Amino acid sequence: MWHAPRTLPAAAWTLLAALTATASAAPFAYVPNEKSGTVTVIDTARQVVVRQLPAGKRPRGIAIDPAGRRLYLSDAAANALVTLELPGGASRSTPLGKSPEGVSVTRDGKLVAIAVEESNSVTLIDAATGAQIADITVAGKNPEHAVFSPDGRWLLVSAEEAEQVDVIDVAQKKQVGAVAVGLRPRGIGFSPNGAIAYVACELVNTVFVIDMESRKAIARIPAGKNANGIVVHPDGKHVYVSNGVDGTVMMIDTATNTVSATIPVGKRPWNMALTPDGARLYVANGRSNSVSVIDTLGARKLADINVGELPWGVVIQ
């Protein structure tokens, strides 16, 4: 069902104004803080916080379009997707189902996908208009992440109460299959060419490697306790997985599917993002209220940056 965009509250206009003032000095890391209702903006050149921005009552999922023109936030309390034009211009809020979480955008910036937990669905939004164009029911219960493949053909969907990753054909706007993995799949990442997907399964402490052509898991990589966040290096040679209980990030060599380094970070590391050149990894530490900065070449932590309460993840542009 199509929903017309609605006017944003004053707090969102404050957020837009602040982002407008800083957008020209990119790259910035944007960190949604679920409990404090803010987005922390980090200058990645200096590793310092430059703003704490109001962002609704419960911001969780976050994505930014490849051109850096729009920031997308799921507000779980308002059941809405907030879209902010960067560096300035129109803003809008699109109603969603109950408890939206993970947000993803296609590489061409045309489509936005949001995993909606209590609806057991993935909502597709037209990025240009803000209109809802599809609401796709998935098999997994409480979907958390919905991630586009690099070519935008597929969406992989992880759900907290599942042992599979659901596969959506974006053109058909429906689920067309599923890949068996371990209990509670969470973070999802793709190799640069989209041939391989990596899925962290929290309750089995394992990263599953999926061949997208056959839609089958072809390898299992032991990770730390409560593996959850996943990000793939731009060169495709390494994958990073956060381990919530251990308070670590593991670096996986994709040539051998083995762990090549384990890096201590903060408490309950969650979702992560790499700088465009892949030189730095930013890790949201949900229980430390901080972001850890990792030097990917040296596989070592460089800094911990204080943010808001219960940071959910990071995007960088």
Where are each of the predicted segments found?
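Predominantly soluble domains enriched in secretory-pathway, periplasmic, or organellar proteins
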Residues: P5, W13-Q317
